[in-house]
Amino acid sequence: MKPVIALVGRPNVGKSTLFNRLTRSRDALVADLPGLTRDRHYGEGRVGARPYLVVDTGGFEPVAKDGILHEMARQTRQAVEEADVVVFIVDGRNGLAPQDKSIADYLRKTGRPIFLVVNKAEGMKYTAVATDFYELGLGDPRAISAAHGDGVTDMINEALEVAYADQPEEEDDNDPSRGIKIAIVGRPNVGKSTLVNALIGEDRVIAFDMPGTTRDSIYVDFERNGKKYTLIDTAGLRRSGKVFEAIEKFSVVKTLQSISDANVVILLLDAQQDISDQDAHIAGFVVEQGRALVIGVNKWDGLDEHARERAKADLTRKLKFLDFAKSHFISAAKKTGIGALMRSVDDAYAAAMAKLPTPKLTRALIEAVEFQQPRRRGPVRPKLRYAHQGGQNPPIIVIHGNALDAVTETYKRYLENRFRETFSLTGTPLRIEFRSSTNPYADKG
């Protein structure tokens, strides 16, 4: 699995700026999705052939006793304890603060690899920046400027050397004994363990535990209606006899790693609770990772008609950027709706892995343009000439033509909908890339 880098520090030291720089290659993929919060806490970065996950923990108040700061501190502690490397960020301009000492005291006790990073160090001599922070007892400080990028590449390379040293060998995704890899994600108490047992069935468990990382990610192979699946542990599910129980609280790190490792993600929601920012953040990460997705709204049997309409409206309003995914209203406890849910898992996987022939893609593109042409931008109208497939899981469609930088986001979404309809691409994100001719005088007007 991809290693996890946790960014920790008191408020306003530049964690979000560093987060954005470390994940910059992925920003464009989600920035234009309507309804998706921009306040992202999880992202992916890559240095060469080494991908990694980043968690921005928010402002860390390690001694907070109550309220929102207490909850943030609890979540931060859990992320730190499960991360492969912790990047502890301090402010080089303002110098050492009492809060930095409290955080350092806590971090030293965790046993995690700690990288002490002095941010906002642009234009300052290293000795002047670093001297204050040696007393934290976390080794040599690394001076960076997250805003300008100074020192960031060297820092993340060092962190990845440590993170990858502890990573087990990657599993073979082409292993024929493995089926579609499914991650079931969601907040605590939404019914993940109940759904797992409904899927696997107590009387016909074909399951075994395989240690993944040192923090015991578990893969459970099972069959359903003659098809093979592999369930990735997301909720600290552990087998008790023939059933699975959730014995750990919600883990951001395990959730991110499971999403990244999956072929299809089931986002499980509680019909009796409003959709939270946490749900939206996790859903956004699924889209960013390009994973096929099915939404399960659990405990549906406990709602009257009015409550059901309210829950559907909440889903449409808060997760409208997931309109490509099928939603199923289920009861894991009563095992209702499970069959339809799994059929959507199969369909989403098939869509994510679909092979799209160039002639058919180009024909679909031409028909879409004939039905609705892109708007002009000044004297220039984009000319869309042909399309081919650039990748799978998620499907990537590459469109060639002239002046394609003038294509609007609205028109891009129109094309996406046309391609989805033509090729039945339900349940998977779809990427569209434009490649323009290098001739600046081509096809003006």
Curated annotation (Swiss-Prot):
Residues reported in the UniProt entry to bind GTP 1: 9-16, 56-60, 119-122
Keywords: GTP-binding, Nucleotide-binding, Repeat, Ribosome biogenesis
Domain of life: Bacteria
A GO MF term: ATP hydrolysis activity
Record-annotated EngA-type G domain positions: 3-167, 180-353
InterPro entries linked to this entry: AAA+_ATPase, G_ENGA, GTP-bd, GTPase_Der, KH_dom-like, KH_dom-like_a/b, P-loop_NTPase, Small_GTP-bd
Positions with a binding annotation for GTP 2: 186-193, 233-237, 298-301
Coiled coil (residue ranges): none
Keyword presence, Repeat: yes
Ranges for domain KH-like: 354-438
A Pfam short name: MMR_HSR1
One GO BP annotation of this record: ribosome biogenesis
Quaternary data: Associates with the 50S ribosomal subunit.
Function statement: GTPase that plays an essential role in the late steps of ribosome biogenesis.
Entry's family note: Belongs to the TRAFAC class TrmE-Era-EngA-EngB-Septin-like GTPase superfamily. EngA (Der) GTPase family.
Protein's name according to its UniProt entry: GTPase Der
The organism of origin for this protein: Burkholderia multivorans (strain ATCC 17616 / 249)
